[in-house]
Amino acid sequence: MAPNLRKSHPLLKMINNSLIDLPTPSNISAWWNFGSLLGICLMTQILTGLLLAMHYTADTTLAFSSVAHTCRNVQYGWLIRNLHANGASFFFICIYLHIGRGFYYGSYLYKETWNTGIILLLTLMATAFVGYVLPWGQMSFWGATVITNLFSAIPYIGQTLVEWAWGGFSVDNPTLTRFFALHFLLPFAIAGLTLIHLTFLHESGSNNPLGIVSNCDKIPFHPYFTLKDILGFTLMVLPLTSLALFSPNLLGDPENFTPANPLVTPPHIKPEWYFLFAYAILRSIPNKLGGVLALAASVLVLFLSPFLHKAKQRTMTFRPLSQLLFWILVTNLFILTWVGSQPVEHPFIIIGQLASITYFTILLILFPIIGTLENKMLNF
């Protein structure tokens, strides 16, 4: 009998083991769709980004005009740009839901997969930040100035580090050029990290909503989950195209329609919506270094999740107290996001400070305590 090429060819064999014959738990829900959606997002962003880069000029005098030219004069340039800008928002929606799923169902106990995932998140955040600077509008310029300036809070080497990042003594042409280079490079680094992420995942196999070993009940990835992923893809593309076609500037800042001007500061400098929770935590501490440390901790705290898991059960499916705490955490993140978009004045300052304290308290103190308490409740 002739060998099956899909199972014998060195390259096709890898694809087969990852996407076709992969044994998958039969009970994984739609929350497991977001990994494949993130892959689709990445491919879409790389494709639209490549097309945009063909018409973009990384020069302070021409950047803003080149983006306007792309939207006005390039065939479907407006659509490519709108898909790219709003695609970033969908990328973050998917990654936050993906992390939330991992947190709820205890997927962080696959330590290597979880850690590479956090590195992926950090790389994505860096990519989105440098990308936001490229149109060289007011918010691009001042966002770049404010965020890069945070590195000056690092003792001893801070100021040198900032000037090295800027390529001068302020955000100017060298900064824009290197940000464009980084924005072009980093998505490919994300693609490479994704392969590492998947390699670690396929070592153990997927987790499932019950958090128990599912070796006795696994089904092939294709056709069952390929079809399910196509449904998820369709359900994501519909709102993305609707947003890009009907309300492309809904999530953007009006300030970015004004070309960058170092002499005029916008009344309220704020990042895109997907960074607002971290920005609110940064602003909640009146000390510069303290704020920077809190900002870093807001994401890096995820590295501690596997070590703070004290419950005997892996997932929160049958842990009502942890569930309650989880949804309080989600609500708290929405509050932080809202506060980050508001001006620095009463009552937003105190709300931001309370929400920041709550965020770290839930993650570092309450989750382990509640996990231990639920273990005791199992004995009753």
UniProtKB/Swiss-Prot annotation:
Gene3D superfamilies xrefs: Cytochrome Bc1 Complex, Chain C
Q: Which cofactor does it need?
A: heme b
Q: Which InterPro entries match?
A: Cyt_b/b6_C, Cyt_b/b6_C_sf, Cyt_b/b6_N, Cytb/b6-like_sf, Cytochrome_b, Cytochrome_b_C_euk/bac, Cytochrome_b_N_euk/bac, Di-haem_cyt_TM
Q: What GO CC annotations are associated with the protein?
A: mitochondrial inner membrane; respiratory chain complex III
GO BP, sorted A to Z: mitochondrial electron transport, ubiquinol to cytochrome c
TM segment ranges: 34-54, 78-99, 114-134, 179-199, 227-247, 289-309, 321-341, 348-368
Q: Which UniProt keywords apply?
A: Electron transport, Heme, Iron, Membrane, Metal-binding, Mitochondrion, Mitochondrion inner membrane, Respiratory chain, Transmembrane, Transmembrane helix, Transport, Ubiquinone
The UniProt entry, under SUPFAM superfamilies, shows: a domain/subunit of cytochrome bc1 complex (Ubiquinol-cytochrome c reductase) (SSF81648), Transmembrane di-heme cytochromes (SSF81342)
Q: How is the cofactor bound?
A: Binds 2 heme b groups non-covalently.
Location in the cell = Mitochondrion inner membrane
Please provide, alphabetically and separated by semicolons, the GO molecular function terms listed in this UniProt record.
metal ion binding; ubiquinol-cytochrome-c reductase activity
Name the residues that bind a ubiquinone.
H202
Q: Which residues bind heme b b566?
A: H98, H197
Q: How does it sit in the membrane?
A: Multi-pass membrane protein
Q: Where does heme b b562 bind?
A: H84, H183
Q: Which family does it belong to?
A: Belongs to the cytochrome b family.
Extra information: Heme 1 (or BL or b562) is low-potential and absorbs at about 562 nm, and heme 2 (or BH or b566) is high-potential and absorbs at about 566 nm.
Summarize subunit and interaction data from the UniProt record for this chain.
Answer: The cytochrome bc1 complex contains 11 subunits: 3 respiratory subunits (MT-CYB, CYC1 and UQCRFS1), 2 core proteins (UQCRC1 and UQCRC2) and 6 low-molecular weight proteins (UQCRH/QCR6, UQCRB/QCR7, UQCRQ/QCR8, UQCR10/QCR9, UQCR11/QCR10 and a cleavage product of UQCRFS1). This cytochrome bc1 complex then forms a dimer.
This molecule's function is given as: Component of the ubiquinol-cytochrome c reductase complex (complex III or cytochrome b-c1 complex) that is part of the mitochondrial respiratory chain. The b-c1 complex mediates electron transfer from ubiquinol to cytochrome c. Contributes to the generation of a proton gradient across the mitochondrial membrane that is then used for ATP synthesis.
Task: Output this protein's name.
Answer: Cytochrome b
Q: Which gene encodes it?
A: MT-CYB
